[in-house]
C-alpha cells in the first residue's frame, strides 16, 4: 500500500489572503485563508478523485484544512479502506458498502475532493430507507501496517455463522433468526414472492410445518438475533 493516494485536481475556486472572516455560506475560514470550495469542512467524509480514472473515488475523513507557504490549500485526511485494500481482501462476510477507518493519515490538495459522502455507524446505516451512492458504513478500525482490526471479536449469525453485514436477509418465522438469502439459496425475487420461511430445526415441529409450509419471507435488518450469542475472532475471518 502506498503511503499516499495521489488525486487529480478539479476546478474549484480558491480565495486567499482574507483575514478574520467567519464561516458564511460557501466560505470556510482557515485562519487567514478563505477557501471557497463550497461543500466540505473539518469532520466531513469526502470522496477523493484517484489518479487512475478507472478506479472508484477514495473515501477519507477531513481532519484539518490549511494553506502552505505558497497558499496552496491542503487537506489533512484519514483514509477509509475498502475490503479489497485490506490484508485479507474482500470476503463473503463484507457488506457491499462497508469501509474500515484506517490509521493511515495523509495530506492531499483540496482540489482532489470531488464531493461529500456519509459514513454511517452500522446501526444508522441499517435504518436507512433508501441507501444512496453516497452512503457507506463502518464497523471496524483498521491498522494498515499490521492488518489488525478493532474490535477484534464480533457476534455471528444463524446458518452461515458469519459476522452480520448489510446484504439482504430474511427472517425465520418460528425462531426469528435472520439468514442471508444467499446462504439458503434464495434470490431476492423469490423471497419477495413467498410468505414464510421455516428452518430445518423448527420444521421438526409438525404443527409448525402445517401452519407455515408455504415458503419464505423477506425481512428488515432491525433487532438482529445472534446465533446462540456466539462470537468469532475477527482476525480469523477478516485478516486471513
Swiss-Prot record:
BAH domain: residues covered: 38-153
InterPro entries, per the entry: BAH_dom, BAH_sf, Znf_FYVE_PHD, Znf_RING/FYVE/PHD
Record-linked Gene3D superfamilies: 2.30.30.490, Zinc/RING finger domain, C3HC4 (zinc finger) (3.30.40.10)
Disulfide bonds, paired cysteine numbers: none
Protein location: Nucleus
Predominant place of localization: nucleus
CDD domains referenced in this protein's UniProt entry, alphabetically: BAH_BAHCC1
Protein keywords: Chromatin regulator, Metal-binding, Nucleus, Transcription, Transcription regulation, Zinc, Zinc-finger
Cellular component terms per the entry's GO annotation: nucleus
Superkingdom assignment: Eukaryota
GO biological process, one term: negative regulation of gene expression, epigenetic
MF (Gene Ontology): chromatin binding; histone H3K4me3 reader activity; transcription cis-regulatory region binding; zinc ion binding
Zinc finger PHD-type: from-to: 155-205
UniProt subunit comment: Recognizes di- and trimethylated histone H3 at lysine 4.
Summary of the function given for this chain in its UniProt record: Chromatin remodeling factor that binds to methylated histone (e.g. H3K4me2/3) to prevent their acetylation (e.g. H3K9K14Ac), likely by recruiting histone deacetylase (HDAC) complexes, and thus regulate the transcription of target genes.
Family per record: Belongs to the SHL1/EBS protein family.
Name recorded for this polypeptide: Chromatin remodeling protein At4g04260
Species the sequence originates in: Arabidopsis thaliana
Upper classification of the organism: Eukaryota, Viridiplantae, Streptophyta, Embryophyta, Tracheophyta
Amino acid at each position: 500500500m502506498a503511503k499516499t493516494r495521489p488525486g487529480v485536481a478539479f476546478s474549484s475556486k480558491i480565495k486567499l489572503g482574507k483575514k478574520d472572516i467567519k464561516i458564511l455560506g460557501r466560505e470556510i475560514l482557515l485562519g487567514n485563508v478563505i477557501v471557497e470550495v463550497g461543500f466540505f469542512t473539518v469532520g466531513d467524509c469526502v470522496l477523493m478523485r484517484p489518479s487512475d480514472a478507472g478506479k472508484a473515488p477514495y473515501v477519507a475523513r477531513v481532519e484539518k484544512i490549511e494553506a502552505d507557504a505558497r497558499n496552496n490549500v491542503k487537506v489533512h485526511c484519514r483514509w477509509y479502506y475498502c475490503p479489497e485494500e485490506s490484508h485479507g481482501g474482500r470476503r463473503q462476510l463484507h457488506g457491499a458498502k462497508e469501509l474500515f477507518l484506517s490509521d493511515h493519515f495523509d495530506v492531499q490538495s483540496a482540489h482532489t475532493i470531488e464531493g461529500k459522502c456519509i459514513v454511517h455507524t452500522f446501526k444508522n446505516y441499517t435504518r436507512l430507507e433508501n441507501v444512496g451512492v453516497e452512503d457507506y458504513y463502518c464497523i471496524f478500525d483498521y491498522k494498515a501496517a499490521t492488518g489488525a482490526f478493532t474490535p477484534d471479536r464480533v457476534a455471528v449469525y444463524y446458518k452461515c455463522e458469519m459476522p452480520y453485514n448489510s446484504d439482504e436477509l430474511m427472517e425465520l418465522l418460528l425462531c426469528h433468526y435472520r439468514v442471508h438469502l444467499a446462504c439458503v439459496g434464495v434470490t431476492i425475487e423469490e423471497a419477495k414472492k413467498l410468505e414464510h420461511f421455516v428452518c430445518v430445526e423448527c420444521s421438526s415441529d409438525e404443527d409448525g410445518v402445517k401452519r407455515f409450509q408455504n415458503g419464505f419471507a423477506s425481512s428488515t435488518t432491525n433487532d438482529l438475533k445472534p446465533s446462540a450469542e456466539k462470537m468469532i475472532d475477527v482476525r480469523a475471518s477478516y485478516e486471513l
